[in-house]
């Protein structure tokens, strides 16, 4: 019953959007209108976002949704008899009959009181069984259902089920459309926590939506070549006490546990909410790298384990001063402890010059990230007219200690050892002012200001003779304006963002002269969007935006990130920003069995930032893995995704994408000479997530993914694929769900590469891809919906380095 109501509500919302566009196309043709106000029968409070559907002889005509004050106004109706349905999740549907005539053009239904449906569970949060995908003018929204929640315990695990998104299972580095230059936000806010770590701390059961914004408007921070991934967490605003509990365990080589708890209480003018997530487990990784560098041929076998424990908590309050003024505050607190231990075994093949090495290591790191957010929103008399002030402060303290010992592999004699004590402290302050004014019913103006101040201090201490410090400060001041216009079947939005960017970096070493870097850039970032809706079953969206990827602290920090006997990983302080011009065209078609969206995109990239490996100029026996700017490059591709209901018992989310890129740059060869190199690469990816409904409460999932080969200037990544099966069963009259999943049933998922620059090499990395997950989710509560809307914006820190390739 709940699922049917949810589908009705969702379809009603979609119909209302289309109907409103259709209405605006005929302003002068149909003079009739229907208005009214919807309230809760028990509390007499107005109900926002209620579906109002107008039918003629049981045939859909038009519709709309109520405002924050519960008011609806539907116009441009012919002189006819209609039935008006008032539909809302958890409430009984009410139908009113009206007749619009020349003598009675404007029908006022006055106040309509609706009551909760006694058949429904009292206040239990409704989670759709199946995830859905919505294509908006500037973003793709994935509404997370139980099928995705059961796909994994954390955000990182379910991201691989999302169209166009890939997560490296070894490093947890995230990419969008094959590019790792992507911003990751949580509730539209940034975090100083590295995205690869953040994805492992967010419980999947706490996620409401995932937004893919591949061509953000001028309102958004322009950083991120491939766009923005915004993770929207559940936040109830139901009257009374509501919440959910989620627990799970994953069995790989070792068990891993996760727990999540969400709680909300609203009474009167206050809404209190909070959630807590806990993850603990040991992860096993192993692999090899074979190098055929002349006179240094070697085989590295490595094995390392991570024992990670994380706590992530969010607590907040909304204070509704009155209908037009709302103050909100929340804080995020994240605690993470990671212990690493393992070894690298280096066997120099047919080489008597170099000694075979064994390097055991262990590391211990503790980090604490804290975010404080304040928001004040004023709503003016005119619907949609608002002013919003927001301040956000984030601080991340991340110390780490690592001990490396180099041994003669045969005799086990100690050659040398060293300790790395690294401390990183990052602070980020952001202040925004946003103004929205609907100038007319079809025209909207948005203006805004933003100030960002980011400071990072990174220190390395090995001994009194070898220590270094790196300070990185960024100040960014922005102003933006967008203007949107709708007419008939068309809608258009254009805008621009002006940014003043200033960066200062200082690198100090005990044994060398200080290194300084400064940059000051004034840039403008335009964006345009054009949408055409010829009918309720078809829509076209065309967009353009200019974006920038400024080097992150992980990409410019010259202090070594990690080390093996043959490779050091470090940043490049001489990196310059890369700029991208992005074009995109999408078409959405609604059919009897669901909706299908297809699109094409093109990106022109200037000074592309990418991974590079070269010989260490200070030690020819070692390589340096770092970053560099390559030449101007091009990438274009196609995407197809669909939400399809083949049968009443079988539905599927399907996505296919293919892209081609031309990469150019100057790369070191085996002779030590740097030469210009160019590569044309084509990659194909596919995903399908099937849901099979066996009974009312029992469902099965079958997920499969294929990630095609990818070529780069130095390395080619091999094909990757896997298949998962899972099931979920509703108990306790629908308030509880038991889920199970068997991941990578054929144990095929691993990372493998082949390289030929600067020398021939190949390797493979393995992790606990094959695993079994068992989980239980319980939802409770007593309230009804009354949501508060807060803006979602892009303000994320650029993703850092991490990972080998």
Per-segment meaning from a language model:
Residues 21-26, 39, 51-55, 87-91, ...:
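Short, acidic, small-residue-rich periplasmic hinge/interaction motif at the N-terminus
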Residues 57-71:
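Short, acidic Ser/Thr/Gly-rich low-complexity loop/linker segments typical of extracellular
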Residues 222-229, 237-287, 308-311:
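Outer-membrane beta-barrel translocator/receptor signature
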Residues 301, 419, 428-432, 466-470, ...:
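Outer membrane beta-barrel strand-and-loop segments of large Gram-negative receptors
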């Amino acid at each position: 019953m709940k699922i049917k109501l949810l589908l009705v509500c969702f379809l009603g919302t979609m119909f209302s959007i289309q109907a409103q566009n259709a209405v605006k196309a005929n302003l002068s043709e149909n003079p009739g209108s229907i208005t009214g106000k919807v309230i809760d029968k028990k509390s007499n409070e107005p109900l926002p976002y209620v579906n109002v559907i107008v039918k003629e002889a049981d045939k859909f005509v038009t519709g709309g949704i109520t405002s924050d004050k519960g008011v609806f106004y539907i116009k441009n109706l012919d002189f006819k008899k209609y039935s008006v349905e008032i539909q809302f999740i958890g409430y009984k549907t009410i139908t009113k009959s009206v007749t619009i005539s020349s003598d009675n053009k404007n029908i006022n239904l006055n106040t309509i009181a609706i009551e909760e449906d006694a058949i429904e569970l009292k206040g239990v949060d409704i989670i759709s069984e199946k995830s859905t995908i919505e294509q908006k003018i500037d973003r793709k929204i994935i509404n997370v259902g139980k099928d995705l929640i059961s796909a994994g315990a954390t955000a990182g695990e379910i991201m691989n089920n999302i169209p166009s998104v890939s997560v490296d299972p070894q490093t947890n580095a995230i990419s969008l459309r094959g590019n790792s230059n992507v911003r990751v936000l949580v509730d539209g806010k940034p975090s100083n926590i590295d995205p690869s770590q953040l994805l492992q701390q967010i419980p999947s059961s706490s996620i409401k939506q995932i937004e893919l914004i591949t061509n953000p408007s001028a309102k958004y921070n322009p950083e991120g070549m491939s766009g923005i991934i915004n993770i929207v967490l559940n936040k109830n605003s139901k009257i009374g006490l509501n919440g959910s509990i989620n627990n799970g365990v994953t069995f790989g080589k070792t068990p891993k546990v996760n727990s999540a708890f969400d709680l909300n209480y609203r009474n009167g003018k206050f809404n209190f909410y909070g959630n807590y997530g806990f993850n603990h487990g040991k992860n096993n990784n192993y692999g090899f790298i074979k190098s055929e560098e002349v006179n240094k041929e070697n085989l590295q076998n490595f094995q390392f384990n991570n024992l990670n424990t994380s706590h992530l908590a969010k607590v907040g309050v909304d204070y509704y001063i009155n209908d037009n003024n709302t103050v909100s505050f929340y804080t995020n607190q994240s605690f993470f402890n990671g212990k690493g231990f393992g070894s690298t075994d280096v066997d120099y093949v047919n080489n008597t010059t170099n000694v075979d090495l064994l390097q055991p290591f262990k590391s211990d790191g503790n980090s604490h990230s804290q975010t404080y957010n304040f928001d004040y929103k004023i709503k003016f008399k005119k619907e949609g007219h608002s002013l919003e002030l927001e301040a956000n402060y984030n601080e991340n303290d991340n110390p780490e200690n690592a001990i490396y010992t180099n041994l003669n592999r045969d005799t086990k004699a100690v050659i040398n050892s060293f300790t790395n004590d690294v401390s990183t402290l990052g602070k980020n302050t952001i202040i925004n002012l946003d103004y929205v004014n609907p100038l007319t019913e079809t025209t909207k103006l948005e203006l805004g200001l933003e100030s960002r101040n980011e400071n990072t201090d990174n220190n390395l201490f090995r001994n009194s003779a070898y220590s270094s410090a790196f300070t990185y400060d960024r100040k960014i001041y922005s102003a933006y304006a967008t203007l949107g216009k709708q007419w008939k079947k068309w809608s258009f939005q254009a805008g621009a963002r002006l940014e003043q960017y200033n960066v200062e970096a200082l690198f100090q070493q005990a044994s060398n002269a200080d290194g300084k870097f400064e940059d000051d850039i004034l840039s403008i970032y335009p964006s345009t969007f054009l949408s055409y809706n010829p009918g309720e079953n078809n829509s076209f969206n065309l967009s353009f935006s200019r974006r920038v990827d400024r080097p992150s602290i992980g990409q410019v920090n010259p202090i070594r990130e990690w080390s093996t006997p043959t490779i050091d990983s470090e940043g490049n302080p001489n990196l310059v920003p890369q700029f991208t011009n992005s074009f995109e065209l999408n078409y959405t078609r609604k059919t009897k069995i669901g909706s299908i969206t297809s699109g094409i995109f093109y990106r022109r990239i200037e000074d592309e930032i990418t991974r590079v490996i070269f010989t260490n100029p200070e030690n020819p026996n070692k390589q340096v893995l770092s970053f560099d700017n390559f030449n101007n490059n091009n990438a274009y591709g196609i995407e197809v995704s669909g939400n399809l209901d083949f049968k009443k018992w079988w539905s599927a989310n399907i996505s296919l994408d293919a892209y081609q890129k031309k990469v150019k740059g100057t790369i070191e060869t085996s002779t030590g000479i740097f030469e210009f190199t160019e590569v044309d690469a084509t990659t194909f990816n596919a995903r399908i997530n099937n849901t099979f409904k066996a009974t009312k409460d029992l469902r099965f999932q079958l997920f499969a993914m294929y990630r095609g080969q990818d070529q780069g200037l130095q390395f080619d990544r091999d094909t990757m694929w896997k298949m998962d099966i899972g099931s979920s069963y509703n108990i306790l009259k629908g308030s509880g769900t038991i889920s199970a999943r068997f991941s990578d049933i054929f144990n095929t998922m691993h990372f493998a590469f082949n390289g030929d620059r600067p020398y021939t090499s190949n390797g493979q990395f393995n992790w606990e891809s094959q695993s079994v997950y068992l989980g239980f989710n319980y939802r409770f509560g007593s309230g009804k919906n009354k949501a508060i809307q807060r803006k979602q914006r892009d303000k994320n820190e650029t993703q850092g380095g991490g990972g080998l390739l």
